[in-house]
Protein backbone atom coordinates (compact mmCIF):
# COMPACT_ATOMS: atom_id res chain seq x y z
CA UNK A 1 0.00 0.00 0.00
CA UNK A 2 1.02 3.62 -0.42
CA UNK A 3 1.52 5.22 2.98
CA UNK A 4 2.66 8.69 4.00
CA UNK A 5 3.88 9.73 7.44
CA UNK A 6 3.62 13.40 8.36
CA UNK A 7 6.30 14.06 10.95
CA UNK A 8 9.64 12.26 11.00
CA UNK A 9 10.28 12.38 14.71
CA UNK A 10 10.70 9.29 16.84
CA UNK A 11 7.34 7.67 16.12
CA UNK A 12 7.16 8.68 12.47
CA UNK A 13 10.68 7.48 11.73
CA UNK A 14 10.41 4.10 13.41
CA UNK A 15 6.94 3.46 11.98
CA UNK A 16 7.80 4.66 8.48
CA UNK A 17 11.06 2.75 8.24
CA UNK A 18 9.55 -0.52 9.44
CA UNK A 19 6.49 -0.10 7.20
CA UNK A 20 8.87 0.26 4.25
CA UNK A 21 10.79 -2.79 5.38
CA UNK A 22 7.50 -4.74 5.55
CA UNK A 23 6.81 -4.02 1.89
CA UNK A 24 4.69 -0.87 1.76
CA UNK A 25 5.61 2.14 -0.33
CA UNK A 26 6.33 4.78 2.29
CA UNK A 27 6.95 8.51 2.13
CA UNK A 28 8.07 10.30 5.29
CA UNK A 29 7.40 14.03 5.27
CA UNK A 30 9.00 16.55 7.59
CA UNK A 31 9.53 20.31 7.56
CA UNK A 32 13.16 19.98 8.67
CA UNK A 33 15.24 20.10 5.46
CA UNK A 34 18.49 19.21 7.24
CA UNK A 35 16.91 16.14 8.84
CA UNK A 36 15.47 15.00 5.50
CA UNK A 37 18.82 15.45 3.76
CA UNK A 38 20.57 13.36 6.41
CA UNK A 39 17.92 10.64 6.32
CA UNK A 40 18.32 10.28 2.57
CA UNK A 41 22.02 9.68 3.30
CA UNK A 42 21.07 7.02 5.87
CA UNK A 43 21.98 9.26 8.83
CA UNK A 44 19.47 8.87 11.66
CA UNK A 45 18.73 11.82 13.98
CA UNK A 46 17.93 9.46 16.87
CA UNK A 47 19.56 6.45 18.44
CA UNK A 48 17.45 3.32 18.32
CA UNK A 49 18.87 -0.20 18.29
CA UNK A 50 18.82 -1.88 14.84
CA UNK A 51 16.89 0.97 13.21
CA UNK A 52 19.84 1.84 10.97
CA UNK A 53 19.78 -1.68 9.50
CA UNK A 54 16.09 -1.44 8.61
CA UNK A 55 16.57 2.07 7.21
CA UNK A 56 19.28 0.77 4.88
CA UNK A 57 17.15 -2.14 3.68
CA UNK A 58 14.04 0.00 3.10
CA UNK A 59 15.96 2.67 1.16
CA UNK A 60 17.84 0.14 -0.96
CA UNK A 61 14.59 -1.62 -1.84
CA UNK A 62 13.24 1.73 -3.07
CA UNK A 63 10.19 1.41 -0.80
CA UNK A 64 11.04 4.39 1.41
CA UNK A 65 11.75 8.01 0.71
CA UNK A 66 12.06 11.18 2.73
CA UNK A 67 10.96 14.63 1.62
CA UNK A 68 9.95 18.04 2.91
CA UNK A 69 7.77 18.82 -0.11
CA UNK A 70 4.00 18.48 0.10
CA UNK A 71 2.97 17.79 -3.48
CA UNK A 72 0.54 15.88 -5.63
CA UNK A 73 2.23 12.56 -4.86
CA UNK A 74 -0.02 12.59 -1.82
CA UNK A 75 -2.90 11.87 -4.18
CA UNK A 76 -1.67 8.27 -4.43
CA UNK A 77 -1.65 7.67 -0.68
CA UNK A 78 -4.00 5.01 0.67
CA UNK A 79 -3.40 6.27 4.19
CA UNK A 80 -1.71 9.23 5.81
CA UNK A 81 -0.39 8.82 9.33
CA UNK A 82 -0.07 11.95 11.45
CA UNK A 83 2.97 11.42 13.69
CA UNK A 84 3.83 14.93 14.86
CA UNK A 85 4.52 15.97 18.43
CA UNK A 86 1.80 16.99 20.88
CA UNK A 87 3.74 18.81 23.62
CA UNK A 88 2.25 19.87 26.93
CA UNK A 89 1.10 23.41 27.46
CA UNK A 90 -0.07 25.16 30.57
CA UNK A 91 -1.30 22.69 33.16
CA UNK A 92 -0.70 19.60 31.04
CA UNK A 93 -3.14 20.17 28.20
CA UNK A 94 -1.86 18.65 24.94
CA UNK A 95 -1.00 21.20 22.27
CA UNK A 96 -2.50 20.01 18.96
CA UNK A 97 -1.06 22.86 16.88
CA UNK A 98 1.25 20.56 14.92
CA UNK A 99 -1.54 18.06 14.30
CA UNK A 100 -3.76 20.71 12.74
CA UNK A 101 -0.80 22.18 10.83
CA UNK A 102 -0.25 18.74 9.30
CA UNK A 103 -3.95 18.36 8.46
CA UNK A 104 -3.97 21.79 6.81
CA UNK A 105 -0.98 20.89 4.63
CA UNK A 106 -2.34 17.61 3.30
CA UNK A 107 -6.12 17.69 2.98
CA UNK A 108 -6.12 19.56 -0.34
CA UNK A 109 -3.64 17.11 -1.90
CA UNK A 110 -5.07 13.71 -0.96
CA UNK A 111 -7.73 11.67 -2.74
CA UNK A 112 -11.21 11.26 -1.30
CA UNK A 113 -10.63 7.61 -0.35
CA UNK A 114 -7.46 8.29 1.63
CA UNK A 115 -7.65 7.41 5.32
CA UNK A 116 -6.22 9.94 7.77
CA UNK A 117 -4.74 8.08 10.73
CA UNK A 118 -3.90 9.92 13.93
CA UNK A 119 -0.94 8.12 15.52
CA UNK A 120 0.15 11.14 17.56
CA UNK A 121 -0.94 10.97 21.19
CA UNK A 122 -4.03 13.16 21.38
CA UNK A 123 -6.77 13.70 24.00
CA UNK A 124 -10.02 11.75 23.63
CA UNK A 125 -12.35 13.56 21.26
CA UNK A 126 -9.56 14.86 19.03
CA UNK A 127 -10.34 12.63 16.05
CA UNK A 128 -14.00 13.63 16.14
CA UNK A 129 -12.95 17.28 16.30
CA UNK A 130 -10.66 16.77 13.30
CA UNK A 131 -13.53 15.23 11.32
CA UNK A 132 -15.68 18.26 12.14
CA UNK A 133 -12.81 20.59 11.25
CA UNK A 134 -12.42 18.97 7.83
CA UNK A 135 -16.16 19.08 7.18
CA UNK A 136 -16.21 22.80 7.98
CA UNK A 137 -13.78 23.24 5.11
CA UNK A 138 -15.80 21.13 2.71
CA UNK A 139 -13.82 17.89 3.01
CA UNK A 140 -15.16 14.53 4.11
CA UNK A 141 -12.38 12.07 4.93
CA UNK A 142 -12.38 9.01 7.09
CA UNK A 143 -10.28 9.59 10.21
CA UNK A 144 -8.97 6.79 12.43
CA UNK A 145 -7.08 6.57 15.70
CA UNK A 146 -4.09 4.23 15.88
CA UNK A 147 -1.98 5.01 18.96
CA UNK A 148 1.60 3.79 19.22
CA UNK A 149 3.10 1.84 22.10
CA UNK A 150 6.79 1.93 21.18
CA UNK A 151 9.36 1.85 23.96
CA UNK A 152 12.50 3.82 23.29
CA UNK A 153 15.40 1.39 23.16
CA UNK A 154 13.28 -1.50 21.88
CA UNK A 155 11.01 0.27 19.39
CA UNK A 156 11.91 -1.91 16.40
CA UNK A 157 11.01 -5.09 18.27
CA UNK A 158 7.89 -3.44 19.65
CA UNK A 159 6.71 -2.53 16.15
CA UNK A 160 7.46 -5.93 14.64
CA UNK A 161 6.10 -7.95 17.58
CA UNK A 162 3.44 -5.80 19.27
CA UNK A 163 1.34 -6.95 22.23
CA UNK A 164 -1.67 -5.54 20.40
CA UNK A 165 -2.66 -3.04 17.73
CA UNK A 166 -5.32 -0.58 18.81
CA UNK A 167 -7.62 0.78 16.11
CA UNK A 168 -10.26 3.41 16.68
CA UNK A 169 -12.69 3.76 13.78
CA UNK A 170 -16.25 4.78 13.01
CA UNK A 171 -16.76 2.56 9.94
CA UNK A 172 -15.73 -0.81 8.49
CA UNK A 173 -13.86 0.77 5.56
CA UNK A 174 -11.34 2.41 7.88
CA UNK A 175 -10.87 -0.81 9.83
CA UNK A 176 -10.25 -2.77 6.62
CA UNK A 177 -7.54 -0.36 5.46
CA UNK A 178 -5.70 -0.51 8.79
CA UNK A 179 -5.94 -4.30 8.95
CA UNK A 180 -4.46 -4.48 5.46
CA UNK A 181 -1.62 -2.14 6.43
CA UNK A 182 -0.71 -4.31 9.41
CA UNK A 183 -1.31 -7.62 7.60
CA UNK A 184 2.45 -8.39 7.33
CA UNK A 185 2.52 -8.67 11.14
CA UNK A 186 0.97 -12.10 11.46
CA UNK A 187 -0.78 -13.34 14.58
CA UNK A 188 -1.20 -9.90 16.10
CA UNK A 189 -4.12 -9.17 18.40
CA UNK A 190 -6.30 -6.26 17.26
CA UNK A 191 -8.34 -4.12 19.61
CA UNK A 192 -10.96 -2.46 17.42
CA UNK A 193 -13.00 0.20 19.17
CA UNK A 194 -14.45 3.67 18.76
CA UNK A 195 -12.34 6.80 18.31
CA UNK A 196 -12.62 8.11 21.86
CA UNK A 197 -11.76 4.81 23.52
CA UNK A 198 -8.76 4.29 21.26
CA UNK A 199 -7.42 7.71 22.16
CA UNK A 200 -8.01 7.06 25.86
CA UNK A 201 -6.27 3.65 25.79
CA UNK A 202 -2.94 5.35 25.09
CA UNK A 203 -3.25 7.78 27.99
CA UNK A 204 -4.54 5.09 30.36
CA UNK A 205 -1.76 2.64 29.43
CA UNK A 206 1.07 5.10 29.97
CA UNK A 207 -0.44 6.48 33.16
CA UNK A 208 -0.88 2.99 34.59
CA UNK A 209 2.75 2.11 33.84
CA UNK A 210 3.85 5.38 35.42
CA UNK A 211 1.82 4.41 38.48
CA UNK A 212 3.67 1.09 38.75
CA UNK A 213 7.00 2.93 38.70
CA UNK A 214 5.93 5.46 41.32
CA UNK A 215 4.58 2.67 43.53
CA UNK A 216 7.74 0.57 43.46
CA UNK A 217 9.84 3.66 44.12
CA UNK A 218 7.88 4.32 47.29
CA UNK A 219 8.22 0.67 48.28
CA UNK A 220 11.98 1.15 47.88
CA UNK A 221 11.80 4.04 50.33
CA UNK A 222 10.02 1.76 52.80
CA UNK A 223 12.62 -0.99 52.30
CA UNK A 224 15.31 1.57 53.05
CA UNK A 225 13.69 2.39 56.39
CA UNK A 226 12.89 -1.12 57.61
CA UNK A 227 15.70 -3.16 56.05
CA UNK A 228 13.83 -4.84 53.21
CA UNK A 229 15.32 -5.90 49.87
CA UNK A 230 13.67 -4.00 47.01
CA UNK A 231 14.97 -6.35 44.31
CA UNK A 232 13.44 -9.36 46.02
CA UNK A 233 10.26 -7.42 46.70
CA UNK A 234 9.95 -6.45 43.03
CA UNK A 235 10.51 -10.04 41.97
CA UNK A 236 8.07 -11.45 44.50
CA UNK A 237 5.37 -9.00 43.47
CA UNK A 238 6.07 -9.09 39.75
CA UNK A 239 5.93 -12.88 39.41
CA UNK A 240 2.24 -12.60 40.20
CA UNK A 241 0.78 -12.86 36.69
CA UNK A 242 -1.92 -10.38 37.61
CA UNK A 243 0.78 -7.74 38.11
CA UNK A 244 3.76 -8.63 35.90
CA UNK A 245 7.46 -7.86 36.31
CA UNK A 246 7.79 -4.97 33.86
CA UNK A 247 8.11 -1.44 35.25
CA UNK A 248 8.87 -2.66 38.76
CA UNK A 249 12.49 -1.56 38.90
CA UNK A 250 12.98 1.05 41.60
CA UNK A 251 14.96 4.12 40.62
CA UNK A 252 15.07 7.91 40.37
CA UNK A 253 11.67 8.25 38.70
CA UNK A 254 10.15 8.02 35.24
CA UNK A 255 10.98 10.40 32.40
CA UNK A 256 11.11 10.58 28.63
CA UNK A 257 8.79 12.11 26.09
CA UNK A 258 5.67 10.10 27.00
CA UNK A 259 4.96 9.19 30.62
CA UNK A 260 5.35 12.65 32.21
CA UNK A 261 3.44 14.36 29.39
CA UNK A 262 0.68 11.78 29.11
CA UNK A 263 -0.15 11.51 32.80
CA UNK A 264 -0.35 15.31 32.99
CA UNK A 265 -2.66 15.34 29.97
CA UNK A 266 -4.89 12.63 31.44
CA UNK A 267 -5.05 14.49 34.74
CA UNK A 268 -5.98 17.66 32.85
CA UNK A 269 -8.72 15.73 31.04
CA UNK A 270 -10.31 14.32 34.19
CA UNK A 271 -10.18 17.70 35.90
CA UNK A 272 -11.91 19.30 32.93
CA UNK A 273 -14.70 16.78 33.45
CA UNK A 274 -14.82 17.51 37.19
CA UNK A 275 -13.49 14.11 38.24
CA UNK A 276 -11.20 14.00 41.25
CA UNK A 277 -8.66 11.38 40.19
CA UNK A 278 -6.45 11.28 43.26
CA UNK A 279 -4.27 8.46 41.96
CA UNK A 280 -3.01 10.51 39.02
CA UNK A 281 -2.26 13.50 41.23
CA UNK A 282 -0.37 11.30 43.68
CA UNK A 283 1.77 9.74 40.94
CA UNK A 284 2.59 13.14 39.44
CA UNK A 285 3.56 14.50 42.86
CA UNK A 286 5.60 11.42 43.78
CA UNK A 287 7.60 11.48 40.56
CA UNK A 288 8.17 15.23 40.68
CA UNK A 289 9.69 14.87 44.14
CA UNK A 290 11.83 11.86 43.27
CA UNK A 291 14.99 13.64 41.97
CA UNK A 292 15.09 15.83 45.09
CA UNK A 293 14.82 12.70 47.22
CA UNK A 294 17.78 11.23 45.36
CA UNK A 295 19.85 14.35 45.98
CA UNK A 296 18.98 14.11 49.69
CA UNK A 297 20.46 10.60 49.70
CA UNK A 298 23.64 11.90 48.09
CA UNK A 299 23.85 14.65 50.71
CA UNK A 300 23.40 12.14 53.54
CA UNK A 301 26.34 10.10 52.27
CA UNK A 302 28.44 13.26 52.18
CA UNK A 303 27.53 14.17 55.77
CA UNK A 304 24.96 16.74 54.67
CA UNK A 305 27.47 19.05 53.00
CA UNK A 306 27.22 19.26 49.20
CA UNK A 307 28.76 22.67 48.55
CA UNK A 308 32.00 22.42 46.60
CA UNK A 309 31.86 18.64 46.31
CA UNK A 310 32.90 16.85 43.11
CA UNK A 311 30.30 14.34 41.96
CA UNK A 312 30.38 11.91 39.03
CA UNK A 313 27.07 11.29 37.28
CA UNK A 314 27.11 8.14 35.15
CA UNK A 315 24.16 8.18 32.76
CA UNK A 316 22.16 11.16 31.55
CA UNK A 317 19.39 9.68 29.39
CA UNK A 318 16.08 8.92 31.05
CA UNK A 319 16.74 5.21 30.58
CA UNK A 320 19.24 2.93 28.85
CA UNK A 321 18.97 2.14 25.14
CA UNK A 322 18.15 5.65 23.96
CA UNK A 323 19.80 9.04 23.48
CA UNK A 324 16.70 10.83 24.79
CA UNK A 325 17.25 13.16 27.74
CA UNK A 326 13.76 14.67 27.74
CA UNK A 327 12.40 14.83 31.30
CA UNK A 328 15.33 12.65 32.36
CA UNK A 329 15.59 12.13 36.13
CA UNK A 330 19.37 12.17 35.71
CA UNK A 331 19.27 15.66 34.21
CA UNK A 332 16.90 16.79 36.98
CA UNK A 333 19.35 15.49 39.59
CA UNK A 334 22.25 17.31 37.91
CA UNK A 335 20.30 20.58 37.90
CA UNK A 336 19.53 20.31 41.61
CA UNK A 337 23.17 19.54 42.40
CA UNK A 338 24.39 22.51 40.36
CA UNK A 339 22.01 24.76 42.27
CA UNK A 340 23.73 23.58 45.45
CA UNK A 341 27.18 24.67 44.19
CA UNK A 342 28.31 21.15 43.36
CA UNK A 343 30.89 20.40 40.67
CA UNK A 344 29.48 17.72 38.37
CA UNK A 345 31.43 15.48 36.00
CA UNK A 346 29.01 13.66 33.71
CA UNK A 347 29.18 10.83 31.19
CA UNK A 348 26.68 8.97 29.05
CA UNK A 349 27.56 6.44 26.32
CA UNK A 350 24.87 7.63 23.87
CA UNK A 351 23.12 10.75 25.17
CA UNK A 352 26.07 13.09 25.72
CA UNK A 353 25.36 15.39 22.77
CA UNK A 354 21.68 15.73 23.62
CA UNK A 355 22.60 16.45 27.23
CA UNK A 356 24.97 19.21 26.12
CA UNK A 357 22.16 20.82 24.13
CA UNK A 358 19.86 20.56 27.14
CA UNK A 359 22.12 21.77 29.94
CA UNK A 360 25.27 23.86 30.22
CA UNK A 361 26.78 25.27 33.41
CA UNK A 362 30.16 26.53 34.56
CA UNK A 363 30.30 23.77 37.19
CA UNK A 364 29.28 21.02 34.77
CA UNK A 365 31.91 19.10 32.83
CA UNK A 366 30.97 16.49 30.23
CA UNK A 367 33.51 13.68 29.85
CA UNK A 368 34.02 11.13 27.09
CA UNK A 369 34.44 8.14 29.38
CA UNK A 370 33.07 6.89 32.66
CA UNK A 371 36.56 6.45 34.04
CA UNK A 372 37.46 10.09 33.37
CA UNK A 373 34.22 11.23 34.99
CA UNK A 374 35.12 9.35 38.17
CA UNK A 375 38.59 10.79 38.67
CA UNK A 376 39.05 12.59 42.00
CA UNK A 377 35.33 12.69 42.87
CA UNK A 378 33.73 12.56 46.30
CA UNK A 379 30.94 10.21 45.20
CA UNK A 380 29.86 8.29 42.09
CA UNK A 381 26.18 8.38 41.14
CA UNK A 382 24.79 5.82 38.71
CA UNK A 383 21.75 7.54 37.25
CA UNK A 384 20.98 5.43 34.15
CA UNK A 385 21.07 1.63 33.86
CA UNK A 386 23.55 1.33 30.98
CA UNK A 387 24.92 -2.24 30.95
CA UNK A 388 28.43 -0.99 30.22
CA UNK A 389 28.60 0.47 33.73
CA UNK A 390 28.47 -3.08 35.07
CA UNK A 391 31.49 -3.97 32.93
CA UNK A 392 33.71 -1.11 34.11
CA UNK A 393 37.01 -1.88 35.80
CA UNK A 394 35.84 -0.81 39.22
CA UNK A 395 39.16 -1.69 40.82
CA UNK A 396 40.82 0.86 38.53
CA UNK A 397 38.15 3.43 39.37
CA UNK A 398 38.62 2.77 43.10
CA UNK A 399 42.22 3.89 42.76
CA UNK A 400 41.17 7.11 40.98
CA UNK A 401 38.43 8.49 43.24
CA UNK A 402 38.87 10.87 46.15
CA UNK A 403 36.29 9.05 48.26
CA UNK A 404 35.22 5.47 47.42
CA UNK A 405 31.45 5.99 47.64
CA UNK A 406 28.92 4.76 45.07
CA UNK A 407 25.19 5.41 45.15
CA UNK A 408 23.46 3.31 42.53
CA UNK A 409 20.06 4.73 41.63
CA UNK A 410 19.43 1.83 39.22
CA UNK A 411 20.54 -1.11 41.38
CA UNK A 412 22.71 -2.54 38.60
CA UNK A 413 25.95 -3.24 40.47
CA UNK A 414 26.63 -6.13 42.83
CA UNK A 415 26.78 -5.03 46.43
CA UNK A 416 29.27 -7.67 47.61
CA UNK A 417 31.62 -7.14 44.66
CA UNK A 418 31.75 -3.40 45.24
CA UNK A 419 32.38 -3.81 48.96
CA UNK A 420 35.18 -6.33 48.36
CA UNK A 421 36.91 -3.75 46.19
CA UNK A 422 36.60 -1.26 49.03
CA UNK A 423 33.68 0.94 48.01
CA UNK A 424 30.94 2.12 50.32
CA UNK A 425 28.07 1.02 48.10
CA UNK A 426 24.43 2.05 48.41
CA UNK A 427 21.53 1.16 46.15
CA UNK A 428 17.98 2.42 45.96
CA UNK A 429 16.05 0.72 48.73
CA UNK A 430 19.07 0.06 50.94
CA UNK A 431 19.79 1.75 54.25
CA UNK A 432 22.06 4.79 54.19
From Swiss-Prot:
Name of the protein in its database record: UDP-glucose 6-dehydrogenase
E.C. number: 1.1.1.22
As given in the record, the signal peptide range reads none
| Upper lineage | Bacteria, Pseudomonadati, Pseudomonadota, Alphaproteobacteria, Rickettsiales
- In the UniProt entry, which residues are flagged as the active site? 258 (nucleophile)
Could you tell me which PANTHER family the record lists for this protein?
UDP-GLUCOSE 6-DEHYDROGENASE TUAD (PTHR43750:SF3)
The annotated pathway is: Nucleotide-sugar biosynthesis; UDP-alpha-D-glucuronate biosynthesis; UDP-alpha-D-glucuronate from UDP-alpha-D-glucose: step 1/1
Q: Which reaction does it catalyse?
A: UDP-alpha-D-glucose + 2 NAD(+) + H2O = UDP-alpha-D-glucuronate + 2 NADH + 3 H(+)
SUPFAM superfamilies recorded for this chain?
A: 6-phosphogluconate dehydrogenase C-terminal domain-like, NAD(P)-binding Rossmann-fold domains, UDP-glucose/GDP-mannose dehydrogenase C-terminal domain
Species source reads Rickettsia conorii (strain ATCC VR-613 / Malish 7)
NCBIfam families, sorted: NDP-sugDHase
Output the superkingdom of the source species.
Bacteria
Q: Which GO terms describe its biological process?
A: polysaccharide biosynthetic process; UDP-glucuronate biosynthetic process
* Binding sites annotated in the UniProt record for NAD(+): 2-19, 30, 35, 121, 152, 261, 326
Q: Which family does it belong to?
A: Belongs to the UDP-glucose/GDP-mannose dehydrogenase family.
Keywords (A to Z) from UniProt = NAD, Oxidoreductase
